[in-house]
């Protein structure tokens, strides 16, 4: 674990996640992945240090569940093109994607990657 400012907090959060993996699924990721998405999401959100985005990152990228990840890039792009208000909440923005895109993990993964790529290249924090 490389320090990125708050290494003690990061270590505590990683320990909490490891404890969850051990207690919840006996360290069996496949067993964890077989749980229903929303049930697993609720359990992940109970873990110290895991919020909406991190829970959804784990569900989509690590476990292959069809759930859309909302991050700063997603918020920025959707606001700039006039789809949402600047301060839109996570569930509302996530529902926009979940309700209008095919419910497919690979599709969500690729769609989000394209948002990130576009935001890094053309939709920067401070427009030029």
Can you annotate each of these PLM segments?
Residues 1-128:
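Catalytic cores of DNA base-excision repair glycosylases
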